């Protein structure tokens, strides 16, 4: 170890070293980032301002939108600036901060999605007691615990990762700091701390997954007992968006954080990282709003308040 030079900063490789392509990637990701930002902020605004959306389901959806905004805002602006300024460097502190926020918000999303599945379970399987069970205090507590556990996990995960020394190459073959890339340049002889963190993350994800699966088993068995097709369709329409969002998020998160690191990162690794960081914030608003009449009506009401009756013709 005496002749090993310790790393004092990192270089984020990104997707290309060609100047024109870097600018193209920067502009493309800027447009995607703005789309994710505006769509999620619109959902937050509608749920906050519209009285008819003051329900547990939309309360959790607003929390999910906040997490999406924060999650996409951690790596993408830095990537855009790097491409437009041709500067790939990031300090160790900046890398640690990026990893802390991304793991915290990602873990928070998993727990919020789990809380949303429980909300759907109570709404469909226990409709008469829904308002009693899912009261304001319970909803706030579930959301607070989700954010808190996410923050604690992110802190522990990041502390474990940066307790290791880094030496040799300072190049991170990604557009943001992720654990698999950092493991490749670690010169620590033991990785028990970080693998313990990965194990805890896997256990938390699997626990949430099991809770959601159990919730949907009860939900589907209840929905199939509804005598009318219209009633079944309405019940399923509130569940499928959540199930789709969770499936996409948990699969991409697994491939980014929990898969064993390879010696040579592939294009697929970077593509999965893009899907994981960009797809949920862009995909979630579309999934939850495209066939959601409540959200459409709330948007019309907001436009009417802002522009008058002409909003009917927009």
From Swiss-Prot:
Glycosylated residues, per the record, are 3, 83
PROSITE patterns annotated for this entry?
G_PROTEIN_RECEP_F1_1, G_PROTEIN_RECEP_F1_2
The stretches that face the Extracellular side, renumbered to this chain, are 1-26, 77-91, 158-193, 259-267
Give the record's membrane topology. Multi-pass membrane protein
Q: Which residues lie on this side of the membrane: Cytoplasmic?
A: 48-55, 113-136, 215-237, 291-314
Q: Which UniProt keywords apply?
A: Cell membrane, Disulfide bond, G-protein coupled receptor, Glycoprotein, Membrane, Olfaction, Receptor, Sensory transduction, Transducer, Transmembrane, Transmembrane helix
A single cellular component GO annotation: plasma membrane
Write down the CDD domains for this protein, in alphabetical order. 7tmA_OR14-like
Q: List the disulfide bonds.
A: 95-177
Xref: Gene3D superfamilies? Rhodopsin 7-helix transmembrane proteins
- What's this protein's function? Odorant receptor.
Q: Which family does it belong to?
A: Belongs to the G-protein coupled receptor 1 family.
The identity of this protein, by name, is Olfactory receptor 14A2
